[in-house]
Amino acid sequence: MKWMSLVFLCGLLAMAVASPLNPGNVIINGDCRHCNVRGG
């Protein structure tokens, strides 16, 4: 099941890079304080 989470995270990152809703919502270093990304 670990690969499923990896694929999900990669897809989420690709979506965030392709069309960012808010610059503050993109997780870069894993330290996200004020973003509303599910699972992050």
Swiss-Prot record:
Keywords: Disulfide bond, Immunity, Innate immunity, Secreted, Signal. Hemolymph. Residues 19-23 form a propeptide. GO terms for biological process: defense response; innate immune response. Disulfide bonds join 32-35. One of its GO terms (cellular component) is extracellular space. Residues 1-18 form the signal peptide. Belongs to the bomanin family. Secreted immune-induced peptide induced by Toll signaling. Has a role in resistance to bacterial and fungal infections. The strength of antimicrobial activity appears to correlate with the overall level of expression. This is Bomanin Short 5.
